[in-house]
Each structure stands twice: as C-alpha cells, then as structure tokens.
Amino acid sequence: MARIAGVDIPRDKRVVISLTYIFGIGRTTAQQILKEAGVSEDTRVRDLTEEELGKIRDVIDKLKVEGDLRREVSLNIKRLIEIGSYRGIRHRRGLPVRGQNTKNNARTRKGPRRTVANKKK
C-alpha cells in the first residue's frame, strides 16, 4: 500500500479512485492532482513509480487535506456556536443547519426517536 498524506491508499485500484480515500479529495480534485503531476488516471497504484508518487505527494502537500481540513471545519463550527448565530444555534441543538424541514424527517441529524409516555387519566 502506498501512503499519501498519512493514509494508506489501496494498491489494486486506479489512482484516481485511490486518491479519494484521502479526506478532502473527491473525484474532481483527484483528476486535477493527476493532471498537475502528469500521471495518467488509468494507471493502478501498484504500477506507479517512486518519482510519480513523489510528484503526487508534492501536489497534495499544497492542499488542505485530512487532519488540517478536519480541524478547520470543526473550528468553523465552534466559531458559529460561540458567536451565537442561527447556524451555530442549530449546530448546538443538533438540528439541520441548512433550512430543511424538521416536522417529519431530519432523523439523521436528530438521532433515533425518543418516545414520550402517555399520562394516565
């Protein structure tokens, strides 16, 4: 397994797919990285030379990926919570942040249902 940005990427897959195992790199970014490094998208990771791996690593080092990106996202959310913005309040309460309806769905964000027992008359 090749190790890029602290992540073991699978050897048997195409490079373009393997790069998406790194947090912060999707298909489009992976294609741009390979274009800049001058590596074909169709090559398998096991067929890459050390030189090509080095070029890919150099390009990825310029991007914000893995731990740095996760830290930035969490700090952005903390900032929203601290300043008390609407989005911060929604984050704090564990509700959808982007204006979705919460009457029926939003179970992913709210978690499993908590049933309330009926009062006997």
UniProtKB/Swiss-Prot annotation:
PROSITE patterns: RIBOSOMAL_S13_1 (PS00646), RIBOSOMAL_S13_2 (PS50159). GO terms for molecular function: rRNA binding; structural constituent of ribosome; tRNA binding. Located at the top of the head of the 30S subunit, it contacts several helices of the 16S rRNA. In the 70S ribosome it contacts the 23S rRNA (bridge B1a) and protein L5 of the 50S subunit (bridge B1b), connecting the 2 subunits; these bridges are implicated in subunit movement. Contacts the tRNAs in the A and P-sites. GO terms for biological process: translation. Keywords: Ribonucleoprotein, Ribosomal protein, RNA-binding, rRNA-binding, tRNA-binding. This is Small ribosomal subunit protein uS13. It comes from Bacillus licheniformis (strain ATCC 14580 / DSM 13 / JCM 2505 / CCUG 7422 / NBRC 12200 / NCIMB 9375 / NCTC 10341 / NRRL NRS-1264 / Gibson 46). The keyword tRNA-binding applies. Disulfide bonds: none annotated. The keyword GTP-binding does not apply.
